[in-house]
Design a protein with these regions (language model features):
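Extracellular/periplasmic, surface-exposed regions of secreted and cell-surface proteins
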Residues: 1-177
Length: 177
């Protein structure tokens, strides 16, 4: 079960500068007996329309510059921090716990940065480009253990994955009359 709180706030100034922020806090039952009882993930975005601030030539009629940062989280699988035994319907009884006892687990996190712009020019062309970087850590894995350990697997949190990239699109919108 997950209980959550969410907010969103958007502010604009003179139709040219905008700030958006969001936040969510989750209290997930998967976090029982873990050092972190809830997790908060915020975001903030800023955009500016220089084409509304300055007088641009008619052939270059729109420009938006944007930046954002966000942090998101996922809880780990259920019942990992509670010493419970799974119920097996096929035998109408409780199975032995097969995973090695766990220490401290934390929610998986991804933090993302993005910078970009959107433009319209020459009566129908559009150009959008973005650079992004996403860092993910506290990933939960369960590698197999040797049968001699008495357990089949162990849950560990490890790794740091970084994704970086550039996205761009060029378009043309023309209406035949």
């Amino acid at each position: 079960q997950t209980q959550s709180f969410f907010y969103s706030l958007e502010l604009g100034w003179k139709s040219q500068l905008f700030v958006t922020t969001t936040g969510r806090n989750d209290w997930a039952s998967q976090l029982a007996n873990s050092p972190q009882k809830s997790f908060f993930y915020p975001s903030v975005g800023v955009s500016w329309l220089p084409s509304s601030t300055f007088n641009f030539p008619e052939k270059f009629n729109y420009l938006k510059i944007r930046a954002s940062w966000a942090s998101v989280a996922n809880p780990f699988p259920r019942e990992l921090t509670i010493a419970t035994h799974p119920y097996d319907d096929t035998i109408s009884g409780w199975d032995d716990k097969s995973n090695y006892p766990i220490g401290q687990l934390y929610p998986e996190r991804t933090k993302t940065w993005e910078l970009g712009f959107d433009a319209r020019f020459l009566h129908g062309f559009t150009l959008s480009a973005s650079w992004y970087r996403a860092d993910t850590y506290n990933q939960t894995f369960n590698p197999n253990l040797s049968a001699s350990s008495g357990y089949s697997d162990i849950y560990i949190q490890t790794g740091h994955v970084r994704n970086t990239g550039v996205e761009a699109s060029l378009g043309y919108d023309h209406q035949w009359k």
